[in-house]
């Protein structure tokens, strides 16, 4: 009986004991444990002043006990910078949703949770935007943990935004299938939509990254074919590249829209689009320079000059950053029997500053047997073709043709003639200086420069590439994009169809085994192409009669006469069967001199998906963090490791 009475008295004493006094400084840090009942207080967080309510309560759902604690937290910093990180996508929606957790609504001294369905809908629409920048979904936006169902009396933190479309292309299901929004798209919006397109049409589309920019942004490609992700025998590979210069944004938006057209028209049964996708593997890289684009976008459409954002984050012009193989081609041109194709990258090139974007594209070119390509630029209305570097460097404007001059002119005209403005004969318009040339010009004859991507394509790979200046404004206003698209629509399709000109075939031995890297030569054209891994090849040729030779180490040489009629618009099939021959040992030791470059080729070891930006401190662990990690550099402790996907 006595022990029970003592326990009762002790309990009563503790119940009536005053709360411990706060030490100096503890109250402002939210560290006081008081018995005072929490009350509603006015919201004073600068990033949450536009919420639909006026009062909140501390501690919040994260047990942060004061305004000061919240403002110094990584969660609050995140919602404050989300607009910049996601380039405007899903904002202010995400910020308001975050505010509903960090500063929840308070009425009559009672906290009200935000609605779970609002969180779930926003996560569904915006998760891909986080994926695009390699960021995990924030833990404090866990829809099950910090949100409530409508039956529990929740509130909608996005009520005032109702009626607005939060995410591009997230439109009602009954919207017309042909609806397209013509606007400038941020990097995250672009990546999000590419992934959505591939997900919804996985039978004809897929996305992949060829590498990362200097600041860590993935260089995303969307591919269209009947077997996405795989090379198919005798099906040619085509690529479009946009936004090589960050401030030249029209090419990026054209490819963004072309992606939509390819999907819509294919599903609606359009014969032209279906024929293209069924017979071609198409790769669209909308933005090769996303870092530069960000800087240009900060200036704004219509206000951007000719410099801001043109270069990469390393201050490199990507169209001057490729190996100079053109000088080597000029040196070889006078040598009897010398080859002007598949010229190796010289060792001296790697001594300079090579952008990760450049390395990624070069490795991409090696991994896929591209046949035809175009790079979309802005600032003029003209189509240029190699060589871009003059035979005599001191002569800025000199006609400098490749051995495939006729074919390149045919390719350039295929785009120019299908473009209503480029083909317009009026000299009083943008691009009027090129009217007498039919809207096309040899690159070096316009102006000479070295290190260009088009010359590298031609001299290092099998691929033919032209450069298309798609408009006189580099960063036009959004209302101009609709007109620009309609001017370029048919030209884009017409040029893609040119990948089916010339001849194609398979080189094999007498047993039907494919022969890789066999050479296909055309008499009178000092430029060979080689067979792919499956022994298939594609040789772009204009109409005419040719003597075509196939040869490979250890096999006989086979020649065939080929005639391509003027009206022939499909590649002619020309197969070769090579017979083995005996090779003397001393001949096996002979190797072309240029093969010595293969002893040092950093491109083979280059990981295009590695992070490249150098961070403070220099430690390997810091350098591997994503580009957006620097936004949280002010936090000495409690850095948001929960935002790292690998954490």
UniProtKB/Swiss-Prot annotation:
GO terms of biological process kind: peptide metabolic process; protein processing; Wnt signaling pathway
GO (cellular component) term, any one: extracellular space
Regulation of activity: Inhibited by 2-mercaptomethyl-3-guanidinoethylthiopropanoic acid (MGTA) and guanidinoethylmercaptosuccinic acid (GEMSA). Inhibited by chelating agents such as EDTA and EGTA.
Cellular location(s): Secreted, Extracellular space, Extracellular matrix
Annotated signal sequence range: 1-18
Free-text function comment from the UniProt entry: Cleaves substrates with C-terminal arginine residues. Modulates the Wnt signaling pathway, probably by cleaving some undefined protein. Regulates the development of skeletal elements during development, probably by activating WNT4.
Protein name: Carboxypeptidase Z
Native source organism of the sequence: Gallus gallus (Chicken)
Lineage: Eukaryota, Metazoa, Chordata, Craniata, Vertebrata
